[in-house]
Regions:
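Conserved catalytic core of the tyrosine transesterase superfamily
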Residues: 1-309
Length: 309
């Protein structure tokens, strides 16, 4: 097996690489850092092919690309798969441009990756996070309601901030949610979330809007266009701020409460397929990742409370 050695990169090694990245910039508007990473991956592969097989990148055969990946077997699966994605895009582009007659990456498969267990919070941590906003103010009331609703329903952040007033069925206790792929689903929420929604609608939203009108359920009070829907970035900033106030120092993500929703349901005996429907997952394998957290919780409880634990 050929041993991979990183040689100095020759920027003029293959003009097709520059043509490809130029096309990506024009057609897809990719960021400069992304284009630089694409160029680096392809140029390193081109150098390796020239050194080991005396072949140009556009002449690469399937077995040669397999050998290239094998030579970098110590690379993490996620990095190898990212690189494979770059190669597949490059050779599809080359085929479309008539530079090659066959795509050598057609049968190359991504490396298997271990499931990434999402970070979540304990039930006590969630309670502390929910209690952090000052609900005596309209902004604090809004924030508490958003946190309560996300934990009660398991919404994605984009779904939460995208809610409109007409999506709320307060009497029925359900939300109409437009999820990934523009798929609509009905999501229930509990009594506590309904109580906070009623308070927000009666006491908070009207104060923030004033004389303005807005379709958004959760509105902002500042910026160039007050009264508009909150952004994902703004909500993420609020989650981090309230986590600090609650003394939570664990790594968080914008979907922390969504992960907690799924994990806590499973911990309390919910059916996996029911959780899949609530989360809006197209494939149950996506939901299965939460069972790893639930099983670990059961192991911890056993170790803590069983006399032979």
């Amino acid at each position: 097996m050929a041993r991979f050695v990183m040689n100095p990169v020759d920027a003029n090694l293959d003009a097709s690489i520059d043509r490809f990245t130029d096309a990506l910039w024009l057609e897809d508007g990719l960021a400069a850092n992304t284009l630089a990473a694409y160029r680096r991956d392809l140029t390193l592969a081109a150098r390796w092919l020239a050194d080991q097989h005396q072949a140009a990148l556009l002449q690469a055969q399937e077995y040669q690309l397999q050998a290239y990946f094998a030579a970098r077997a110590d690379t993490r699966a996620s990095s190898a798969n990212r690189r494979l994605t770059v190669f597949k895009r490059y050779f599809r582009w080359a085929l479309r441009e008539g530079l090659i007659t066959q795509d050598p990456t057609l049968k190359l498969l991504p490396a298997r990756q271990p499931p990434r267990v999402p970070k979540t919070l304990s039930e006590a941590q969630v309670e502390a996070l929910l209690a952090a906003p000052d609900t005596d103010t309209p902004l604090g009331l809004r924030d508490r309601t958003m946190l309560e609703l996300m934990y009660a329903s398991g919404l994605r952040v984009s779904e939460l901030v995208g809610l409109k007033s007409i999506d709320l069925g307060l009497n029925e206790g359900v939300l109409r949610v437009l999820g990934k792929g523009s798929k609509e689903r009905l999501v229930p929420f509990g009594e506590l979330a309904r109580d906070w929604l009623e308070r927000w609608l009666q006491d908070g939203r009207a104060q923030l809007l004033g004389a303005r009108q807005s379709e958004a359920l959760f509105v902002t009070s500042a910026g160039r266009t007050p009264g508009t829907a909150m952004s994902r970035v703004m909500f993420w900033g609020l989650v981090k701020r309230y986590a600090r106030q609650a003394g939570i120092h664990a790594p968080l993500s914008p979907h922390t409460l969504r992960h907690a929703f799924a994990t806590h349901l499973l911990n309390h005996g919910a059916d996996l397929r029911a959780v899949q429907l609530l989360l809006g997952h197209a494939d149950i394998s996506t939901t299965t990742i939460y069972t790893h957290i639930a099983r670990q919780r059961l192991k911890d409880l056993h170790a803590q409370h069983h006399p032979r634990g």
